[in-house]
């Protein structure tokens, strides 16, 4: 998929009424905490793979310094349940998250462009 410039964090989407984009980054407190965090993130993806919620995209990267970057796109309307945050696995991910990580930098993002193929 390729897309042009968007100057807002929420814009109309063909897949849903509004497309929210959020980027979060945080450092892990230790390599062990990063490993635990990764296992919990993998469980979120396993649940999303089982439940297959529509109108949502989610990408998590573990960087070489054991920090994490989460990028999410949600096509739900304001006031509707976030399909990622409403999973049991995400609740488990959130449990103790403050002890596993440092300060979170979380920002709404504007999509400038995207080219997507199969990611492994």
Where are the predicted features?
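Glycine-rich beta-strand-turn "strand-cap" elements at beta-sheet edges
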Residues: 1-20, 27-28, 56-67, 90-120
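A short local loop/turn or secondary-structure capping micro-motif enriched for an aromatic residue
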Residues: 31, 77-80, 115
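Onset of an N-terminal alpha helix
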Residues: 17, 38-41
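Short beta-strand-to-loop capping motifs
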Residues: 25-30, 72-76
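Short, surface-exposed ligand-recognition loops at beta-strand->loop->(often short) alpha-helix junctions
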Residues: 27-39
């Amino acid at each position: 998929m390729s897309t042009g410039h968007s100057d807002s964090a929420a814009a109309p989407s063909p897949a849903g009424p509004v497309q929210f984009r959020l980027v979060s980054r945080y450092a892990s407190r230790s390599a062990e905490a990063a490993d635990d965090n990764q296992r919990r993130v993998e469980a979120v993806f396993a649940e999303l793979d089982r439940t297959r919620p529509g109108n949502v995209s989610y990408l998590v990267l573990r960087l070489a310094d054991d920090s994490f970057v989460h990028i999410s796109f949600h096509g739900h309307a304001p006031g509707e349940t976030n399909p990622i945050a409403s999973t049991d696995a995400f609740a488990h991910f959130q449990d103790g998250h403050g002890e596993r990580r440092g300060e979170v930098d979380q920002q709404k993002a504007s999509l400038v462009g995207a080219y997507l193929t199969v990611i492994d």
